[in-house]
Amino acid sequence: MKRLILTLSIVLLAQLVIFSQNQPVYFQVGTSSESMESVAGTVRSALENSGFRIIGEYNPANSDSLYAICYTRKDLEEIALSFTDRGALASALKVGLKKEYNSVKISMINPMYLFYGYFIDGIDKKESALLKISEDAKSALKDVGSEFKPFGGELSKEKLQKYHYKVMMPYFKDAEELNEFDSFEEGLKVIRGNLEKGKGNTKNVYELVYADKKVAVFGVGLLNVEDGESQFLPIIGEDHIAAMPYEIILQGNEATILPGRFRIALHWPELTMGTFMKIMSTPGDIKNTLQGLTE
């Protein structure tokens, strides 16, 4: 009995240490000399063998040197749906691949960073379960690489729960409305139809539909060469490729997105104001493109 209590105490203490730490945005999992296709296959297998489900993948900016793999798991989906303020946006986790010369760099978004940034109200009750999902994802990718070097900046749980880039910049709760439909079903039909047509040079990378909850999330590739990913990613940093794709969420009859000035800043928190000014039009361009998918 004493041994059990001691073990539980150690586990609890370890969790408290993790919860109190600053969370990096990304981990560099490792580097491979294999081809992009081969590395992507290894990542897929590693995640699927650990109970995760691959929901979509694509070449951001239509670049052969960039690749994003999106995945989820049933327990994550259930937790995400319990956060009614757009929590389903955190259902999709991402791995990024970037080809540099004769090697491929593998990175992943840190699940706990995303969870703290997106699950605003009531995360404490779900924290242990979310930590397990995060650790399972990292453990799965140990078959791919062993570095797990943090990069991209770091923030504390406290700051992530109320994150905004600067004074007068939006918070998570300041979602931008794209359109309102007569019903959830109509919204689903319109968005799907426009994505099938590739309207606005977009790509339907993944969709998660929870019809019983009247919630759907679409991961959308922004492939317009003038104002899409190929325009802004080279400026703010392609190493953060596990931030893509951008998302639309349909809840009930309303389609919304996270403001670009929030979502971009959250995934690139080390951006200087000078660099942000270089993509000043990007948040509006993204909104216009995604709004077009709802019309």
What are these regions (language model features)?
Residues 21-62, 120, 142-215:
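Terminal, regulation- and interaction-focused segments at domain boundaries
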Residues 30, 71, 81-85, 214-219:
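Compact, glycine-rich, soluble single-domain proteins
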Residues 95-115, 250-264:
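Beta-strand/loop substructures that line and gate deep hydrophobic ligand-binding cavities in soluble
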Residues 65-108:
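Mid-chain, structured segments of secreted extracytoplasmic proteins
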